[in-house]
UniProtKB/Swiss-Prot annotation:
Regulator of exopolysaccharide synthesis. Represses the activation of EPS II (exp) genes for galactoglucan and activates the EPS I (exo) genes for succinoglycan. Also negatively regulates its own transcription. This is Transcriptional regulatory protein MucR. Belongs to the ros/MucR family. One of its GO terms (molecular function) is zinc ion binding. The keyword NADP does not apply. The gene is mucR. The keyword Nucleus does not apply.
Length: 143
């Protein structure tokens, strides 16, 4: 800014301060000792409003590394953040992207039932657990 515009700006602030204080004093009882403080406060408030308003930049939605449809395949699941393929995404998301599965789903607008494990891998794990007898009640001993 040039000195001329600074002077004009400062003069405008003084005029506005005078008008506001005059209007306030005409409708309110203000002790004479508090007038300098009132004038300084109004001038300071007006001076702080001369700063330009911050420009709000719209946040662009991130582009996934692959399409959501192609990210889930039978034998692998692809990370939308980096494009890597995995059998299980949960650990990768936490260690490389610092995201929980819920945060990942929210970030990419995925449904709550979006898998974090490749379907074939989940099926193999399920089959193995059933063969081992996990999830079944144990027989009671000696009664």
């Amino acid at each position: 800014m040039t000195e001329t515009s600074l002077g004009t700006s400062n003069e405008l602030l003084v005029e506005l301060t005078a008008e506001i204080v005059a209007a306030y004093v005409s409708n309110h009882v203000v002790p004479v000792a508090e007038l300098p403080t009132l004038i300084a406060d109004v001038h300071s408030a007006l001076n702080n409003t001369t700063a330009p308003a911050p420009v709000v930049v719209p946040v662009e939605k991130p582009k996934p590394a692959v399409s959501v449809r192609k990210s889930v395949q039978d034998d692998q699941i692809t990370c939308l953040e980096c494009g890597g393929t995995f059998k299980s995404l949960k650990r990768h998301l936490m260690t490389h992207h610092n995201l929980s599965p819920e945060e990942y789903r929210d970030k990419w607008d995925l449904p709550a039932d979006y898998p974090m494990v490749a379907p074939a891998y989940a099926e193999a794990r399920s089959r193995l657990a059933k063969e081992m007898g996990l999830g079944q009640r144990r027989k009671r001993r000696g009664k």
